[in-house]
Curated annotation (Swiss-Prot):
Keywords: Cell inner membrane, Cell membrane, Heme biosynthesis, Membrane, Transferase, Transmembrane, Transmembrane helix. InterPro entries: Protohaem_IX_farnesylTrfase (IPR006369), UbiA_prenyltransferase (IPR000537), UbiA_prenylTrfase_CS (IPR030470), UbiA_sf (IPR044878). This is Protoheme IX farnesyltransferase. It is an enzyme of class 2 (transferase). It catalyses: heme b + (2E,6E)-farnesyl diphosphate + H2O = Fe(II)-heme o + diphosphate. It comes from Synechococcus sp. (strain RCC307). Pfam families: UbiA. The lineage of its organism: Bacteria, Bacillati, Cyanobacteriota, Cyanophyceae, Synechococcales.
Length: 329
């Protein structure tokens, strides 16, 4: 008798990030959520690029990015520690180091303390106290405000809790000048507006998982249609806010303004397509992935805008736009 093949269910995590693209990490590194750190460091660089002091001396740049990475890792560990029981109940997270028993809670706590202390020492000694304080604020807001207070209680958890992910630009600005100027606050606001559309796209993929443990994410409470409309609104707000970078950049603003248009067009297109069919997992996955590339792209454009080439381009364009009209004969 022929053997009947048994279908093996694909995990929700593999649907979002296929396993062939993921590398198995040791448990002490896994709980630090290292895949989230590069985008946080990119926005830190963006905050620096918006200051008059860019480029920074290499030692200060290295200390800022190193301290930021350690602080973000500490926040990730504390998040995993607090949500250990919750993670064990969800398909996507049940294999994490703590719920699977590959790492103990006491070990995780010691790792978090070491990371937080390392971040503070590096930022205080190598950068300045304001950057260190803002980094600590980001850590606390992620763990206390978002993870403990907001996430289990309200559909607005990511709207308000997104402040944690928006603090790195302030750290970058503080590292560059010792204070936070208009550019740093602009990028902070942009990341705040970007976060809901990014995260709700992921939440549409993980609705069943969140529902099973009672986490009131917007798709769980309001449904996919309402979520799709909300994603559209925040996508438009993100695009509008992104254009203000033209005014906040010390140089190269027009270069940035032109180069950001294709990024904005693609973001709006994908948000609109998801709004039309909010139950479509492929569209939700596509927007989630593009939103990550979008924010990386914004930060890259900010860095490129501060180059001599971009500054010259912007100045020449301004000259062309301000030429007096030719005299009529």
């Amino acid at each position: 008798m022929a053997e009947v093949p048994i279908a093996v269910p694909v995990s929700i995590r593999d649907e979002v990030v296929p396993s062939r693209k993921r590398v198995k990490l040791p448990p002490w590194l896994e709980i630090a959520k290292p895949r989230l750190i590069p985008l946080l460091l990119a926005t830190t660089l963006g905050g620096m690029a918006l200051s008059e002091s860019w480029p920074l001396p290499l030692p200060r740049l290295a200390c800022t990015l190193g301290g930021g990475a350690l602080a973000a890792a500490a926040a990730g560990v504390l998040n995993c520690l607090w949500e250990e029981q919750l993670d064990g109940q969800m398909q996507r997270t049940s294999g994490r180091a703590l719920p699977s028993g590959r790492l103990s809670g006491s070990q995780a706590f010691l790792i978090a303390v070491a990371l937080a202390c390392g971040a503070s020492l590096l930022l205080v000694a190598g950068v300045n106290c304001l950057a260190a304080g803002l980094s600590l604020l980001g850590l606390c807001s992620y763990v206390l405000l978002y993870t403990i207070v907001l996430k289990p209680r309200t559909t607005r958890n990511i709207v308000i809790g997104g402040v944690a992910g928006a603090i790195p630009p302030l750290v970058g600005a503080a590292a560059a000048t010792g204070h936070v100027g208009l550019g740093g606050w602009w990028l902070f606001g942009l990341v705040m507006l970007w976060t809901p559309a990014h995260f709700w796209a992921l939440a549409l993929l993980l609705t069943d998982d969140y529902r099973s443990v009672g986490i009131p994410m917007l798709p769980v409470v309001k449904g996919p249609e309402v979520t799709g409309r909300a994603i559209n609104r925040y996508a438009y707000a993100t695009v509008a806010a992104s254009l203000l970078g033209v005014l906040t950049l010390p140089s190269g603003g027009l270069f940035y303004g032109l180069m950001v248009l294709p990024f904005n067009g693609r973001l709006l297109q994908m948000a609109q397509r998801l709004g039309e069919l909010p139950d479509d997992k492929q569209r939700a996955k596509g927007l989630f992935r593009w939103s990550i590339l979008y924010l990386f792209g914004i930060c890259l454009l900010l860095l490129l805008a501060r180059t001599t080439m971009a500054a010259d381009f912007s100045n020449q364009l301004i000259s062309l736009l301000t030429l007096p009209p030719a005299s009529a004969f």
